[in-house]
């Protein structure tokens, strides 16, 4: 025997699916005669909504999605872990979308997620980290937000009004600079990232501001913005060490870069932190696994994911969470920083 669906009920009653939903969920007035007709058909067929029908009735699927640019970068799985644990505790299942840094793939996922009728989206990296996001990409995200709530993590779309959860990366970068200054460093460099990304430039600007308070600055030749991977950090650190007057300390855009910088420094026969200090950013699990253990800035990555889900859950349930949730960074001192060598 063929199962009766909500569509069959609507067809037999000659009404829309949404009208059947309103009757079942009692969410809005329905003419008494229409309600009686629908209820009579439901009783006749002994209709019991399945999961799909319940989602139509409630307009919820119990599924949320997270879009991120690089699952191999240790920062993003840590955020995902916090988000997934919180989501499962709230009864959601999770849809992971890894874009591999491809903006077109971001658009494809947005289209798929709308078709899947997920209840909401957490968005990391990609277009929301661009210093200037192209109008079409910004508009696409804003249009999507009219159909389902979206929470941005460590990023922004200017004038979009979208909810944000982020760590104050500028404050974290200033902490890194202050830590090195307290150890007597005056020759400081910055390695990693990309100039078109706000997550890079907010750190560079914060470091420069802190140094200028002490009458110092990072010259252009010591700002090597060459990517986010371990290999990128290794390559850019090698360039620094080839300079006539290498720095005594290096601030890296993330822990991956810092690990690459450590590898290069050791290959050059230098000692860390005796000859040069290196500080990372993020406090991923790799930071305490490398030798020497990495001094770094914690972004509270697990909490970023958890808080993002909490905000999204409140939006899904018609709540009014604050527009911005800001987490404070923390300096984690380990073995890779020490007094200046000169």
Task: Give the residues covered by each predicted segment.
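Residues that mark the start of a beta-strand
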Residues: 63, 185-187, 248-249
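Alpha-helical structural signal in soluble globular domains
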Residues: 41, 82, 86, 140-144, ...
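Flexible loop/turn connectors
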Residues: 236-342
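Conserved functional loop/turn residues at catalytic and ligand-binding sites
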Residues: 5-8, 14, 24, 46, ...
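Alpha-helical recognition/docking segments in bacterial nutrient-uptake
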Residues: 1-5, 59-178, 182, 242
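Hinge/beta->alpha junction and helix N-cap segments in small-molecule ligand-binding domains
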Residues: 69-78, 96-105, 125-131, 155, ...
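N-terminal helix-turn-helix DNA-binding module of bacterial transcription factors
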Residues: 1-60, 205, 341
């Amino acid at each position: 025997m063929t199962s009766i669906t909500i569509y069959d009920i609507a067809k037999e009653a000659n009404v829309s699916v949404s009208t059947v939903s309103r009757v079942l969920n009692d969410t809005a007035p329905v003419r008494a005669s229409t309600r009686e007709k629908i209820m009579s058909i439901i009783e006749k067929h002994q209709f019991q909504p399945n999961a799909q029908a319940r989602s139509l009735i409630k307009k919820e699927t119990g599924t949320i999605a997270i879009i991120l640019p690089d699952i191999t970068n240790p920062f993003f799985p840590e955020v995902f872990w916090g988000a997934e644990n919180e989501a499962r505790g709230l009864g959601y299942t999770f849809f992971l979308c890894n874009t591999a840094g491809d903006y077109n793939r971001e658009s494809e996922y947005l289209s798929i997620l709308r078709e899947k009728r997920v209840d909401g989206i957490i968005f990391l990296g990609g277009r929301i980290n661009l210093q200037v996001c192209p109008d079409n990409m910004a508009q696409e995200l804003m249009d999507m937000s009219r159909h389902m709530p979206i929470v941005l993590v460590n990023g922004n779309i200017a004038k979009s009004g979208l909810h944000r959860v982020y760590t104050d990366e500028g404050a974290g970068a200033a902490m890194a600079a202050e830590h090195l200054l307290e150890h007597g460093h005056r020759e400081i460099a910055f390695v990693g990232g990309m100039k078109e990304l706000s997550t890079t430039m907010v750190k560079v600007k914060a470091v420069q501001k802190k140094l200028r308070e002490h009458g110092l600055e990072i010259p252009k030749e010591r700002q090597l913005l060459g990517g986010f991977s371990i290999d990128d950090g290794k390559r850019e650190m090698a360039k620094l060490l080839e300079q006539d007057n290498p720095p005594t300390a290096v601030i890296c855009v993330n822990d991956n870069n810092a690990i690459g910088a450590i590898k290069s420094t050791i290959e050059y026969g230098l000692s860390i932190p005796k000859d040069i200090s290196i500080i990372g950013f993020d406090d991923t699990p790799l930071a305490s696994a490398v030798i020497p253990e990495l001094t770094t800035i914690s972004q509270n990555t697990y909490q970023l994911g958890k808080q993002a889900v909490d905000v999204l859950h409140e939006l899904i349930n018609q709540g009014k969470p604050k527009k911005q949730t800001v987490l404070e960074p923390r300096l984690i001192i380990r073995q890779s920083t020490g007094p200046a060598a000169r």
